Amino acid sequence: MFVARSIAADHKDLIHDVSFDFHGRRMATCSSDQSVKVWDKSESGDWHCTASWKTHSGSVWRVTWAHPEFGQVLASCSFDRTAAVWEEIVGESNDKLRGQSHWVKRTTLVDSRTSVTDVKFAPKHMGLMLATCSADGIVRIYEAPDVMNLSQWSLQHEISCKLSCSCISWNPSSSRAHSPMIAVGSDDSSPNAMAKVQIFEYNENTRKYAKAETLMTVTDPVHDIAFAPNLGRSFHILAIATKDVRIFTLKPVRKELTSSGGPTKFEIHIVAHFDNHNSQVWRVSWNITGTVLASSGDDGCVRLWKANYMDNWKCTGILKGNGSPVNGSSQQGTSNPSLGSNIPSLQNSLNGSSAGRKHS
């Protein structure tokens, strides 16, 4: 059962993103009011705003947490063409702010010449790295070589996507069989911009990212994209928020069947396709086991999707904007039964979803 709690966020404008930390006890929100707020969950389950500050000189599109082994670290990105990294500092014993925490800007990443539309930390096994994407069609990957000094970030890679970028997602798999991989979505509306999802893979030989696949069937603007946690699967699952919800599987083709030294090739299948929102879908987010997908759309609802024992994806719950459940929520979309879901456990730890627009 899902319990909904309403929070008076007190942002002065549209909230574009909601992000939970690794443990689900901290939350960050960002808004067109140029601010980020941090919320902490009390023992009673209530959320309290513990920090609020102006982060950028334009709308803040996204905010995201680093893995806690790197400390309490946030990254944000904005229409002001920058991304920023923030760290929470707790006052020392000789400080008048003893025991109190505050957030300090550690760096500003200024390489983009256009709006920075998404920012994501890499999976922790890759070290402290983050990726940004921007409206100029470039994905940039940065690394902090010294995790104790978050003011120093070096630009490691620039990936040209040829299309205005709206969202990115790292493949979270830590398997040595899988090279680092990042999916990029585009909301480019120009008539010659066809396929809106590209997947890039790191090549150990060239030490560069190369395009592995393009999802040719996704031709509508993409607002969000999310790889599912892997949990030992031999294939990858990718969710896409566009005018509907789509779930794809990417199964690696055996190396001996592909050109040596080139990027991995995949068999790509769409396994679920839902237009139940009857509107633009703005966010998709997986639970920690990669078994439940949450989506939010312009219909004002969050919908939960899960593969049943027959491996058909179905809607298992609908929450309205005020948090109340919708009766008769077992709506079905178009689902392909070829997806194997052999993980029975259902975790209730869903990441935040928010319907935010990125006018630029």
UniProtKB/Swiss-Prot annotation:
Source organism, top-level taxon: Eukaryota
Gene Ontology process terms (BP): attachment of mitotic spindle microtubules to kinetochore; cell division; cellular response to amino acid starvation; cellular response to nutrient levels; mitotic metaphase chromosome alignment; mRNA transport; nuclear pore organization; positive regulation of TORC1 signaling
Record comment: activity regulation: The GATOR2 complex is negatively regulated by the upstream amino acid sensors CASTOR1 and SESN2, which sequester the GATOR2 complex in absence of amino acids. In the presence of abundant amino acids, GATOR2 is released from CASTOR1 and SESN2 and activated.
Segments for region (Disordered): 324-360
Gene3D superfamilies registered for this protein in UniProt: YVTN repeat-like/Quinoprotein amine dehydrogenase
This protein's record includes keyword Cell cycle: yes
Phosphoserine found at: 179, 190
Cell compartments where the protein resides: Chromosome, Centromere, Kinetochore; Nucleus, Nuclear pore complex; Lysosome membrane
Function of the molecule: Component of the Nup107-160 subcomplex of the nuclear pore complex (NPC). The Nup107-160 subcomplex is required for the assembly of a functional NPC. The Nup107-160 subcomplex is also required for normal kinetochore microtubule attachment, mitotic progression and chromosome segregation. This subunit plays a role in recruitment of the Nup107-160 subcomplex to the kinetochore.
Xref: PANTHER family: NUCLEAR PORE COMPLEX PROTEIN SEC13 / SEH1 FAMILY MEMBER, NUCLEOPORIN SEH1
UniProt protein name: Nucleoporin SEH1
Gene this chain is encoded by: SEH1L
